[in-house]
Amino acid sequence: MTEQRKVCLRGSGLTKVFGFGRQKTLAVDHVDFSFYEGEIVSIVGESGSGKTTLAKMLLGLINPTEGEVYFQGKERDIGTHKKKKEYWKNIQAIFQDPFSSYNIFHKIDAVLLDCINMRGGRKYPYERKVE
């Protein structure tokens, strides 16, 4: 029997543009994703690739220019301070110092495999873990 995983956080077409006219900067460009209950997610990328901007949109700290965030199957509603506080009780991000997070001499798949194995992922084949 196949295990049915529930989507807890989903983004559709998330885009963030800062500035306007010739000073316009496209920080996040139409990102789609689904995060599932019980899943640990790490967003990695080069400096300036939009990781922090995406995280701030997911947390509701900044609004997307386009796109929607869905939480527990419904369009996220954080229009009031009270609703935002309630949302924040259910979601968390951990921003890390990049120099203390990863060993630059290890390949990223080896670093992520260590994390997966620590969380009980030893039962999955290597290919499934790093896909």
Which residues does each predicted region cover?
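Helix-to-loop junction immediately C-terminal to a conserved catalytic motif
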Residues: 59
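ABC nucleotide-binding domain signature
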Residues: 42, 85-96, 110
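Q-loop/switch helix immediately C-terminal to the Walker
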Residues: 97, 104-118
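A short, flexible loop at the N-terminus of ABC-type nucleotide-binding domains that lies
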Residues: 5-8, 17-30, 37, 80-83, ...
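ABC ATPase NBD coupling module
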Residues: 76-92, 118
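Conserved Walker
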Residues: 52-53
